[in-house]
Amino acid sequence: MARDADTLFRLTAGLIEDHLPGQSPWTTTEAIGANGFGADPLFEALIAERDGQPIGFVSFFRGYAGWRGKAMGIVHALYVLPEERRSGAARALMAGVARIAREREWIRIELFVEEGRPAISFYDRIGMRDLNHRHMRLEGEALERLALDSPGIV
């Protein structure tokens, strides 16, 4: 567990560096360990290795497709070391999530990807469809303000 949490931390740092050069990770090895390997895990992860060395990971969790009334998988992050890209590692990681989805009878896998990212063509190649949805986020002060807004009906 501790080794996997450390591996996921290092790979997450690489993912952050790809997206926001110079930015330090906002998480810690301890947080990854507690959130992924504790009594009530918030996510699962698969780690790809070559010759015993980690080269990438995918993290995912179970979600709910309300319109269909069934469970689904949500990929939170997919990352492969730059020198290992186009090696089949990303496809193997996503295939692993697909096998888990099939075993657990999840009806689909979803993920969010930033516009213009090179990964979009990879997702197209493995059969994912672009839904053209917006990804919205509420956090920080906006979350706090909304939480305090109570019309008294909930």
Q: What residue ranges belong to the model's regions?
A:
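Conserved beta-strand in the GNAT
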Residues: 47, 53-62, 74, 79
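Conserved GNAT acetyl-CoA-binding A-motif
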Residues: 94, 101-114
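A short beta-loop-alpha structural element at the N-terminal edge
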Residues: 1-10
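Conserved beta-strand-loop-alpha-helix junction that forms the acyl-donor binding cleft
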Residues: 85, 109-120, 137-142
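Conserved active-site alpha-helix within GNAT-family acetyltransferase domains
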Residues: 91, 103, 115-132, 138
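Conserved GNAT-fold acetyl-CoA-binding loop/helix
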Residues: 9-34
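Conserved acetyl-CoA-binding loop-helix of GNAT-fold acetyltransferases
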Residues: 80, 86-99, 125
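A short helix-loop-beta-strand connector motif used in the catalytic cores of GNAT acetyltransferases and
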Residues: 35-47, 74
